[in-house]
From Swiss-Prot:
Catalytic activity, EC: 2.7.7.7
GO biological process terms, semicolon-separated: DNA-templated DNA replication; intein-mediated protein splicing
Post-translational modification: This protein undergoes a protein self splicing that involves a post-translational excision of the intervening region (intein) followed by peptide ligation.
InterPro entries assigned: DNA-dir_DNA_pol_B (IPR006172), DNA-dir_DNA_pol_B_CS (IPR017964), DNA-dir_DNA_pol_B_exonuc (IPR006133), DNA-dir_DNA_pol_B_multi_dom (IPR006134), DNA/RNA_pol_sf (IPR043502), DNA_pol_B_thumb (IPR042087), DNA_pol_palm_dom_sf (IPR023211), DNA_pol_type-B (IPR050240)
Pfam families: DNA_pol_B, DNA_pol_B_exo1, Intein_splicing, LAGLIDADG_3, PI-TkoII_IV
Source organism of this protein record: Methanocaldococcus jannaschii (strain ATCC 43067 / DSM 2661 / JAL-1 / JCM 10045 / NBRC 100440) (Methanococcus jannaschii)
Known catalytic reactions: DNA(n) + a 2'-deoxyribonucleoside 5'-triphosphate = DNA(n+1) + diphosphate
Name of the protein in its database record: DNA polymerase
Length: 1634
């Protein structure tokens, strides 16, 4: 550390930064009592070369590159050092920069040809300093001996600070609204500083706001730590803005530095150099699990205190009335901010020490970022280079790669006593299974890595379990298993709303079949168990050459040719003609089919000892593998002649690999053949028949270039037949097999009895005794396999990482490849401890030692400050230790228009068209794009933006999905992990499908950004694909005289021949303007140098021009040419060519380039609404009628005038405006796609136009839409896509919309719904959430910058999991993450099994904890003894540092569902996880009832008492014995009452108060009581002072207030809703204790 210590010996570092002094970066270390400066620490980064050793010449090349790019001046020194990059040590170059701000410029060095990669160039300089140096922040540090001297938290002066500002009807504006007061609270109490007198003892009055600001600065400078609640984003930015108005600098820094407001991601960061500003809002969000994070909510949840609340909009009233309540409110803000700060501060200090970064940075880091800096510190100590953050392409690849998550046991529902908690640190011999390549074998002979016959085909065996067992076996139809083994049964669903043919598959304990089974379930059998087993044995014994010849037959039938030609040639040596007999065997495949190519090469090498030649077709990915040997040709010809004698399975494998594919949309295997291949397809069908694989055979006819053709299609669709295909045939390539396996997994088992692969049988059960070994298998994929032909079931993280040495730098090392255990195909180094395991081991050992010290201290009663500090540290150590469904409408911006498309169809179609460009990542498919854009929004500015779509993505998914319906009628279907955006506490935050809740305010667009493009339609180009009958008499007129055509023809010929004899200036200038050529005039030699810019376009233009010259009709300075003559060339002709052209029939032409201006837009508005196209014969002539029908008389004249302005014609006839013009008819039909009365369509070009053009369209649209029966604020249509288009158009001009399905009528679009808005966004409330199971493709977009896009007019996002699996992590490893979760599942399952064998009944287990009871009633002491014995036993079986630890004894507990339970220990401490607490907007009676019910169940163990509490409350309510105050419901206004389209109780009360002259604003909390009556709930809401207790609606309060908070808990212990209302049978307590 290059700095002078002076007299400093012991002090504590609280902050660090750097400053630029005399162009040099100086590190500032802010201690409690002084400031240290380090001028010697320099910024640096590493450069890796393509070679292992760095030579002097390499340094010179680096210097030369830097000098050439004017960068060498930014380099202070260049060194060669040795560093470890992942697993390998090598020489790298260390570039030391002159200043941190020069490092980004020096990154250009990556472009140097000898450079492979650059590292550590993006680590902030001040953070880099703390990584490289030993000093630990927030610790009393001995600077002389460089070590900590105490664990005590440094004594720092701390204060909480809060401001109140003038708040008008909207959000406060610092340009306009003053600061009214500031409150402060420290260890001695608090005060409020203001410039107005109030009657309050804790007030200090200054002269005005300017003096108030000065006083705030003066006060804050007295403290080391400043607590705020949302100070980053509100208090400090507002203070700085107001200070600027008065010319005051906010010099709050310890060395007089100014307050710095920085942007950090989505938020601001208010930084005070040398002081610790702790914003408690992000900490609360990180550490607490709440529904809302207001200061009031956090105070209540942490301390049970209800602080004083004043709505922000009421502050002005309190201020005006000098109401001292405002002072008390402000003071409480500071007081409770201080209290929260003191609560969290010790934990944040421990994070700061462990991660080695300052508390300002730590409090703004996510857990993942903390882990990253911890690993970077460890990497520095280990001399390892820190990996780079991923670029966008790598990030998307990581995001798209998924794996199976951790294991959670579904809990035993009910109430239990004497629970112990622990925390993580089968079939007999002779059972038959089918093993791939072996046939039917005994289960004891199965090896790990074998593939056995499972529910979805071949499934890999990950683990074979073997136990000694003595006891009873259950014999189920000949399959013997232990009593706790699970057998899946198929049940018919009995529900009137469910299809009678639907079924479900449930796992049943074998022992349950003896007692509970009633005969309705069916065993699931494999019909072909023995056949498949025999086939596998047969294949295993078969000669390989025979199989290869069979595969070759299939390959040649699909992709091969046998070519024999006799070529005559003259043999000059013999002086006569001779015949050459040529023999060739050729197979053509795509170069990307690597597995297929390797197989073909292997077959020829193995059978004929021949290396195939390879020939590539120019400009394509097609390659031909060939053989020109006569003897090989004849052998293959003989094999093909006898193809019926070969193995059908292998023939089909070769054929389907070549010509077949997996249709992932229909989930089928498909192969098709053309007209001439009927015999071939019938042969393939016959082979499938021989194997018993069912298929569908289709023939469809079509016409191509005048020829009538046919295609023959075979499709294998059913799950059973797909499984048989995968088992008996399969594909050659891994990619196709992966897709096949995926579609099999997606297929349901609902109709399992109908599948050929499966069979069903009634259950027959018996019991027998057994002593000996029992076995079970753990499989990849679904946990089911066939044993004796019957389907059967098979039976932490930090510790796992350490035990297996899991780390990216130990993954798949070469040194341990042959000795390390293989897990999911990977292994980890045994010789060197990895970076992540070492870091975790240190953390865990540190935590274990701390907990031991704490335990000893607790035993002797030393629960003091040191104990509390240790507790904070161990807690901090513990803390450190998905997509859219296909039918949703995506809004996409293409070059020629904005399209509203179904996301699945759109992405599927593009992937079909560009299948050669698809990239694969696991089972995900990625298609990168260049010219697509979409609507997005910036989360900070809340403004809509148009962003580039970088890639389209799809991948198979099976699991839970949600249909989320919003108040506006918008709906979206998302997977459980896909994120939307919600508005919460003034911020926009992401919310996953799993976490969306009723009432959330979801972000949708109010205003979309216009593309604002001048849209010009090239009519000739856009009519290329029109019906030739309709365009055959079209003519293009070009306004140029013949002389120009002659000169241009000559110029084109001369340029083509590169002999420009005569230069026509106007011609070469014209060709340059068309973008076909460029030229340079060389005056000295009087020469023009011409360069053709695009050969293909130039040739197309010349062909087009030659055709015009040949067929054109020249007269009167223009040329007429039949459109049909030049149609084939037009696609490549520049638009400018048609600037002086018209197009149409001989009568009635319009400009060939049609500008979409305001007049045309208005015409389209009229036409889309009420327009019709009609083609009819009148007097032998074809009439092309364009009409607008049934408009109101006041608009009919305007419509007629618009017709004439745009197209020069149009007349009013009765109830319509009409014209006859063929070219206009064609433009409307083929380009704008309008005029079909049954299918309305808005021209896509319109979406690209300016806002004024869109407004003109909407003006015409609304006028045409309006009639005597309807207004213009609501539109009905049956076509969802059409209304989606219309919704976007209105959003483009800033008009918000509501989209509502209407039963049996389609959809309704409403304009200007009165919803809350934030800039370009509208806030739409969640009204319905429907969960469902989905299997199939899901889709996503990668969008530049914002990573969000518009689906169903809702903004959607995507999300990630875990640090190792976090796609933006530096130390990312999907393989490591997958292995960690796999091993977690494995050891949890092992522990459950061992616990059950030991005598425990496991109630619930996941990666967080283990809860169990003893199977029989025993004493507490005996139970704890058993638990300790089991801990010792299981820890001897668990690997390495992975341990089960006895956590405690619980007197009683209630288990509801996964992750939802409540427990009480001996001392009355209650642990609650996941159970829904009452919401703020429930009445007090709801809160009281829930609390009393939990007390009755947990403290007393009395279900009857809990039930009676609820029943008594209901009884008291019916008898009106409840206090009226306990029935008041409080609900917050989320927008102006006038903006609510539909009403609600609190809205009606608010409107009533406003009518009475009361001031009501957004955010106000309204109290009301519901009274009885027949009107709606909203109309029956009354102010509490208006209500007598006899008026209340008893049933409303029972069903909506009392029961909801307790019903889930009571149902878990077996009490129904009817019983609670005294409407059902009574239950006894004994029934529920297990």
């Amino acid at each position: 550390m290059g700095m002078s210590m002076g007299k400093i010996k012991i002090d504590a570092l609280i902050d660090n930064t750097y400053k630029t002094i005399e162009d040099k970066a100086v590190i500032y270390l802010y201690l409690i009592n002084s400031i240290l400066k380090d001028r010697d620490f320099k910024p640096y980064f590493y450069v890796e070369l393509h070679k292992e050793k760095v030579e002097n010449e390499d340094i010179e090349k680096i210097k030369e590159f830097l000098l050439k790019n004017d960068l060498l001046k930014f380099v202070e020194n260049i060194e060669v050092v040795k560093k470890i990059i992942l697993r390998k040590e090598k020489e790298v170059i260390k570039i030391i920069a002159t200043h941190p701000q020069k490092v980004p410029k020096l990154r250009k060095i990556k472009e140097c040809e000898i450079v492979k990669e650059i590292y550590e160039h993006d680590i902030p300089f001040a953070k880099r300093y703390l990584i490289d140096n030993e000093i630990i922040p927030m610790t009393y540090w001995d600077f002389e001996n460089k070590k900590p001297v105490s664990i005590e938290i440094p004594k720092l002066k701390s204060v909480a600070f809060d401001m109140e500002v003038y708040n008008r009807d909207t959000e406060p504006n610092p340009e306009r609204d003053p600061i009214l007061m500031a409150s402060f609270w420290d260890e001695n109490g608090g005060k409020v500083i203001t410039y107005k007198e109030f009657n309050h003892p804790n007030i200090e009055v200054v002269k005005n706001e300017k003096e108030l600001i000065k006083k705030i600065i003066e006060t804050l400078k007295e403290y080391d730590v400043i607590y705020t609640y949302n100070g980053d984003n509100f208090d400090f930015p507002y203070l700085k803005a107001r200070a600027k108005i008065y010319g005051i600098d906010i010099n709050l820094g310890k060395d007089g530095e100014e307050l710095k407001i920085k942007r950090g991601g989505m938020e601001y960061r208010s930084y005070i150099p040398g002081r610790v500003h702790i914003d408690l809002y992000p900490i609360s969000r990180r550490l607490l699990k709440l529904t809302k994070y207001t200061l009031e909510d956090v105070v209540y949840n942490l301390f049970g205190i209800e602080k004083l609340k004043i709505p922000h909009t009421k502050i002005v009233d309190y201020w005006a009335n000098n109401d001292k309540t405002l002072i008390e409110y402000s003071l409480q803000d500071a007081k409770y901010t201080y209290k929260i700060g003191k609560y969290f501060f010790p934990l944040e200090v421990m994070f700061s020490r462990i991660v080695n970064q300052t508390p300002f940075e730590i409090t703004r880091m996510s857990s993942g970022q903390m882990v990253e800096y911890l690993l970077m510190k460890r990497a520095f100590k280990e001399n390892m280079i820190v990996p780079n953050k991923p670029d966008e392409e790598e990030y998307r690849r990581r995001v798209l790669t998924t794996y199976e998550g951790g294991y959670v046991k579904e809990p035993e529902k009910g109430m239990f006593e004497d629970i112990i908690s622990m925390d993580f640190r089968c079939h007999p011999k002779g059972t038959k299974v089918v093993v791939k390549g072996k046939g039917i074998v005994n289960i004891e002979d199965v090896k790990e890595g074998n593939y056995v016959l499972g529910i979805d085909g071949w499934q890999k065996v990950k683990k074979v379990w073997k136990y000694e067992y003595e006891g009873e076996l259950i014999n189920v139809n000949g399959l013997k298993c232990t009593p706790n083994h699970k057998i899946p049964l198929r049940y018919k669903i009995k529900h009137k709303k469910i299809n009678k043919n639907d079924y479900l598959v449930r796992d049943i304990y074998a022992k349950s079949l003896l007692t509970k089974f009633k005969g309705e379930g069916k065993l699931i059998l494999c019909k072909d168990f023995e056949t498949i087993g025999n086939y596998e044995k047969y294949i295993n014994d078969m000669d390989e050459d025979f199989i290869l010849k069979s595969e070759l037959i299939g390959i040649l039938l699909a992709e091969g040719h046998l070519l024999r030609r006799d070529i005559e040639y003259f043999d000059s040596s013999r002086g006569k003609k001779r015949i050459s007999h040529q023999y060739r065997v050729e197979i053509t495949v795509n170069e990307d089919e690597k597995d297929f190519i390797e197989k073909i090469k292997y077959i020829f090498k193995k059978l004929f000892n021949y290396e195939l030649y390879v020939r590539r077709k120019k400009g394509t990915k097609a390659i031909t593998l060939g053989c020109a040997k006569k003897d090989i040709y004849l052998k293959i010809e003989e094999i093909l002649k006898n193809k019926e004698k070969y193995l059908p399975n292998a023939i089909l494998r070769g054929f389907f690999e070549g010509d077949g594919y997996v249709n992932t949309v229909r989930r089928a295997v498909v192969v098709n053949q053309g007209t001439n291949n009927y015999d071939k397809i019938k042969f393939i069908a016959s082979l499938l028949d021989r194997l018993g694989i069912k298929y569908s055979f289709y023939t469809y006819s079509y016409e191509e270039r005048g020829k009538k053709l046919k295609r023959y299609v075979i499709e294998i669709f059913s799950k059973g037949d797909l499984i048989k295909f995968s088992i008996l045939i399969s594909f050659i390539s891994r990619r196709k097999n992966n897709l096949l396996n995926e579609i099999i997994r997606q297929k349901t088992l609902y109709k399992i009895g109908d599948y050929g692969f499966y069979d069903l049988d009634d259950v027959c059960v018996s019991l027998e005794s057994y002593k000996g070994e029992v076995y079970d298998l753990t499989l990849e994929g679904r946990p089911y396999y066939f044993a004796n032909g019957i389907l059967t079931h098979n039976s932490l993280y930090p510790s796992i990482i350490i035990s297996y040495n899991i780390s990216p730098d130990t993954l798949d090392c070469e040194c341990c490849k042959d000795v390390s255990e293989k897990i999911l195909g990977h292994w980890f180094c045994k010789k060197k401890e990895g970076l992540i395991p070492k870091t975790l081991r240190n953390l865990i050992e540190r935590r274990i030692n701390i907990k031991r010290r704490m335990k000893k201290m607790a035993e002797i009663g030393e629960i003091n400050e040191e104990y509390n500090l240790l507790d904070y540290e161990q807690k901090s150590l513990k803390i450190l230790a998905n997509s859219i469904l296909p039918d949703e409408y995506l809004t996409i911006i293409e070059e020629d228009g904005i399209k509203v498309v179904k996301i699945g169809e759109y992405i599927d179609d593009l992937m079909r068209k560009h299948k050669d460009k698809i990239k694969f990542s696991g089972i995900s498919e990625i298609l990168e794009t260049k010219n697509l854009k979409t609507f997005s929004f910036d989360k900070i500015t809340k403004k809509c933006e148009i962003k580039k779509v970088k890639a389209l993505i799809r991948h198979p998914y099976f699991g839970k999905a949600y249909k989320i319906k919003l108040r506006s009628g918008r709906t979206i279907k998302v997977t459980r992990g896909h994120s939307l955006f919600k508005y919460e506490n003034g911020k926009i935050v992401e919310v996953k499908g799993d976490d969306v809740r009723f009432g959330d305010l979801i972000v949708v667009p109010k205003k979309l950004t216009c593309v604002d493009k001048e849209v010009v339609i090239n009519i000739p180009k856009r009519l290329i694909n029109a019906d030739e009958e309709e365009i055959k008499d079209l003519v293009i007129t070009k306004h140029k005289d013949k002389a120009f055509f002659v000169k241009l023809k000559k110029t084109l010929e001369d340029i083509e021949n590169n002999k420009l004899k005569v230069i026509f200036d106007d011609c070469i200038l014209y060709l340059k303007e068309l973008g076909l050529i460029d030229y340079n005039i060389i005056k000295k030699i009087n020469k023009v140098d011409i360069k053709i810019l695009d050969e293909e376009k130039f040739k197309a233009y010349k062909k087009y021009f030659d055709t015009v010259i040949e067929h054109g009709n020249f007269k009167k300075g223009r040329c007429n040419i039949q459109y049909i003559k030049i149609k084939d060339y037009i696609a490549n002709i520049p638009d400018k060519e048609f600037e002086d052209c018209e197009i149409g029939a001989y009568s009635g032409k319009i400009n060939a380039l049609l500008k979409l201006d305001e007049k045309l837009a208005k015409f389209l508005g009229f036409f889309v609404t009420r327009g019709r196209l009609k083609k009819q014969k009148l007097k032998g002539e074809t009439v092309y009628e364009i009409s607008v029908y049934k408009s109101l008389p006041e608009y009919q004249k305007e419509i007629a005038e618009t017709f004439k302005e745009v197209f020069g014609a149009g007349s009013m006839v009765k109830d319509k405006v009409t014209m006859d013009n063929k070219i206009v008819y064609l433009v409307l039909k083929y380009i704008f796609k309008c005029g079909d009365k049954d299918k309305k369509h808005i021209p896509e070009e319109l979406f690209l136009a300016s806002e004024s053009v869109i407004k003109s369209f909407l003006d015409g649209f609304l006028k045409a839409k309006k009639n005597s029966h309807k207004g213009t604020s609501t539109f009905m249509a049956k076509d969802e896509k059409y209304l989606n288009q219309l919704m976007i158009l209105f959003n483009l001009v800033g008009i918000p919309t509501r989209f509502t399905p209407v039963k049996n009528k389609g959809y309704k679009l409403t304009l200007n719904p009165k919803y809350g808005t934030v800039k370009d966004l509208m806030l739409d409330e969640v009204k319905e959430i429907e969960a469902f199971e989905y299997s199939g493709y899901v889709y996503d977009l990668s969008v530049e910058d914002n990573e969000n896009f518009l689906v169903n007019n809702i903004y959607a996002h995507n999300s990630v999991y875990g640090y190792l699996a976090f796609p933006r992590a530096r130390f990312y490893s999907r393989e490591c993450a997958e292995i960690v979760t796999y091993l977690g599942r494995k050891y949890i399952l092992e522990t459950v099994k061992e616990a059950e064998k030991f005598g425990f009944k496991v109630l619930y287990i996941d990666t967080d904890g283990f809860y169990a009871i003893w199977k029989e009633k025993i004493s507490k002491e005996e139970l704890i003894k058993k638990a300790m014995e089991f801990v010792e036993y299981i820890n001897s079986k668990l690997p390495g540092t992975m341990e089960l630890e006895f956590e405690g004894y619980f007197k009683r507990g209630i288990f509801v569902t996964k992750k939802r339970y409540a427990l009480i220990d001996e001392n009355g401490r209650v642990t609650v996880k996941g159970l829904e607490f009452v919401r703020r907007d429930w009445s007090n009676i709801a809160k009281i009832t829930q609390r009393r019910v939990l007390e009755a169940l947990l403290v007393e163990g009395s279900i009857e008492k809990a039930k009676k509490i609820i029943q008594d409350v209901i009884k008291d309510l019916r008898e009106k014995k409840i206090k009226k105050e306990d029935l008041i419901i409080y609900t917050q206004l989320t927008k102006d009452p006038k903006e609510y389209k539909t009403t609600a109780p609190h809205v009606e009360i608010a409107k009533k108060l406003m009518r009475e002259g009361k001031r009501i604003k957004v955010g106000d909390i309204i109290g009301y009581i519901i009274v009885k009556g027949t009107k709606s709930i909203s109309e029956r809401a009354k102010l509490p002072e208006e209500v007598d207790i006899d008026d209340i609606d008893v049933n409303y309060y029972i069903d909506n207030q009392i029961l909801p908070p307790v019903l889930r808990i009571m149902e878990a212990v077996g009490v129904s809703k009817n019983e609670l209302k005294k409407e059902g049978a009574q239950l006894t307590l004994d029934k529920f204790f297990k």
